[in-house]
Amino acid sequence: MDHCGALFLCLCLLTLQNATTETWEELLSYMENMQVSRGRSSVFSSRQLHQLEQMLLNTSFPGYNLTLQTPTIQSLAFKLSCDFSGLSLTSATLKRVPQAGGQHARGQHAMQFPAELTRDACKTRPRELRLICIYFSNTHFFKDENNSSLLNNYVLGAQLSHGHVNNLRDPVNISFWHNQSLEGYTLTCVFWKEGARKQPWGGWSPEGCRTEQPSHSQVLCRCNHLTYFAVLMQLSPALVPAELLAPLTYISLVGCSISIVASLITVLLHFHFRKQSDSLTRIHMNLHASVLLLNIAFLLSPAFAMSPVPGSACTALAAALHYALLSCLTWMAIEGFNLYLLLGRVYNIYIRRYVFKLGVLGWGAPALLVLLSLSVKSSVYGPCTIPVFDSWENGTGFQNMSICWVRSPVVHSVLVMGYGGLTSLFNLVVLAWALWTLRRLRERADAPSVRACHDTVTVLGLTVLLGTTWALAFFSFGVFLLPQLFLFTILNSLYGFFLFLWFCSQRCRSEAEAKAQIEAFSSSQTTQ
């Protein structure tokens, strides 16, 4: 009888082992079928995914964990107890299946679960729990209405048996690595929210997740719940075609060099004729000085961003470049304000120590803004990568070029684009008002056609003086991108040269008027 009982027990164990093996085979077969049927509807995809989750939660396996893997799906299951102290998983330690084209080399990922994970579940059911993780290396099961681009096309999911996990005080950390720098991209940690945005399957949502970027190639997601996670990638700036990089660089180099020489000549001529200068000329010279500083800092910026140069030197040059740009924009606005005083307030425009006060504003305010940015966080300045794509590869490949510039998206949005936008808007309004005022004055003249050429020169000069060409920076999108790149590069790299031409024309005009007054005075004296 004892022998019969032992034999019966052995048969039961063998049967249980065979059933467990069949379950693993069924799971693996099901995962392979999911890859074959991935082109079906989103509703069918959700059913497949939920079925895989239930199979992982209910399957039996010996030991602590179970790992199953196909070329694009990896499933893991872990047995947890209420004394759970945390769990860390990395793609480097997991068994990986070689993929065609070396797709596994795109990047790595990791998940870190806190000890708090099992707290609520153990309060209601203090028994063994099951944690499952499902990793996808494609996005076929998570298509939203925007066809969003995901970092490495990775989707990492996790679920705990016996209820949902939400509002964790110690978040789940999900890390993604890429084999190239991610600068130039807006990266957002998101999770798959079923039924979101009126979609039958769901959509990506950033709720409950915080995005951090510890390095140029890593994204860290801190989320207070469990679900399927990914990182959305969006291009911050419009990508520059690689074949246009060389001509744009050459134009910038030549244009800025010409502007530097022209600005130096203008400043030297000003010091030579300093006794004859007035407040208007001194304001022009401050604008020339800011443009000179801007061009010099801009030409040095790419060289200082290279690796042999210390990072502190690049940070200092980036701050100097930002300061020069803010000073240049401020002096453009001062030119607009001064033009308003000249045309609008014909009488009583004397302001005590006028040029000195403008100098404090033009040079002091930008310095204060830059120092404030540095005091808040010194890393706002440094090497900044500009993404450049290769159109011969259909935009799939990109390379990077670096300059010393503003690295913080907030500082760039507020103190570069916002500051420049307000300055350009103010000067465009002043320019329109000045042209309307000049037209009204010309209508009162006896022979307006005689002044047509002079008015054209005046309009072009005012356009240059007020820096309205810098407004082209806000047209770098869509069909305007390529024309904007060349127009902005040509016009603004030669900005110092155009100011030099304006200075020369104004100088010749003032000398001609002075000569005419002397001749008129001499003729009147002769007549008497």
Curated annotation (Swiss-Prot):
Annotated transmembrane regions: 246-271, 281-304, 315-340, 354-377, 411-435, 456-477, 482-505
Keyword presence, Transmembrane helix: yes
GO cellular component terms attached to this protein's record: membrane; plasma membrane
Bridged cysteine pairs (disulfide): 189-221, 209-223, 314-404
Site, as annotated: Cleavage: 226-227
Cytoplasmic side: 272-280, 341-353, 436-455, 506-528
Protein keywords: Cell membrane, Disulfide bond, G-protein coupled receptor, Glycoprotein, Membrane, Receptor, Signal, Transducer, Transmembrane, Transmembrane helix
Region (GPS): 189-239
Post-translational events: Autoproteolytically processed at the GPS region of the GAIN-B domain; this cleavage modulates receptor activity. N-glycsylated.
GO biological process: adenylate cyclase-activating G protein-coupled receptor signaling pathway; cell surface receptor signaling pathway; G protein-coupled receptor signaling pathway
Stretch list, region Stachel: 228-236
Keyword Signal: yes
Tissue: Expressed in immune cells. Primarily found in granulocytes. Found in eosinophils.
Chief location bin: membrane
Residue ranges, Extracellular side: 22-245, 305-314, 378-410, 478-481
Compartments where located: Cell membrane
Subunit structure: Heterodimer of 2 chains generated by proteolytic processing; the large extracellular N-terminal fragment and the membrane-bound C-terminal fragment predominantly remain associated and non-covalently linked.
Similarity remark: Belongs to the G-protein coupled receptor 2 family. Adhesion G-protein coupled receptor (ADGR) subfamily.
Cited function: Orphan adhesion G-protein coupled receptor (aGPCR). Ligand binding causes a conformation change that triggers signaling via guanine nucleotide-binding proteins (G proteins) and modulates the activity of downstream effectors, such as adenylate cyclase. ADGRG5 is specifically coupled to G(s) G proteins and mediates activation of adenylate cyclase activity.
Name of the protein described by the UniProt record: Adhesion G-protein coupled receptor G5
Organism the protein comes from: Homo sapiens (Human)
Lineage: Eukaryota, Metazoa, Chordata, Craniata, Vertebrata
